[in-house]
């Protein structure tokens, strides 16, 4: 388990997902360290998928978005992760921020937008 004032990262064994819960906006190491921890979880749990709850605290910061493409994405590809889930709010307030990430991520992963873990569970059960 990883915990900070910005983000909590945990492993959900039932769903076999690493769950990244953003609490408030952050950047640089405060943004990157939780994602590096998530990569380690995915490496250690075969078939583990990635799920980010973006309803609180997620914003697009150009340097961190580039870091996702340059560092997170290549490292995630070294794991057995096949699906990436973004939990969004009903009005999808972060649509623009997430579209940039999703366009690149969806080239290599199955990307889903969900309204909660129940939706994630349904997709994984298909």
Residue ranges, per PLM feature:
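Amphipathic, Lys/Arg-enriched alpha-helical "gate/interface" segment within cytosolic domains
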Residues: 1-126
């Amino acid at each position: 388990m990883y915990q900070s004032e910005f983000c909590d990262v945990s492993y959900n064994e039932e769903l076999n997902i690493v769950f990244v819960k953003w609490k408030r906006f952050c950047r640089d190491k405060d943004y990157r360290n939780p994602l590096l921890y998530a990569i380690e979880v995915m490496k250690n749990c075969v078939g583990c998928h990635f799920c980010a709850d973006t309803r609180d605290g997620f914003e697009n910061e150009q340097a961190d978005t580039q870091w996702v493409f340059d560092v997170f994405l290549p490292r995630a590809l070294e794991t057995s992760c096949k699906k990436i889930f973004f939990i969004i709010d009903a009005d999808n307030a972060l649509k623009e921020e997430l579209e940039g990430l999703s366009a690149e991520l969806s080239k290599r992963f199955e990307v889903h937008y969900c309204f909660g873990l129940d939706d994630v569970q349904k997709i994984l059960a298909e």
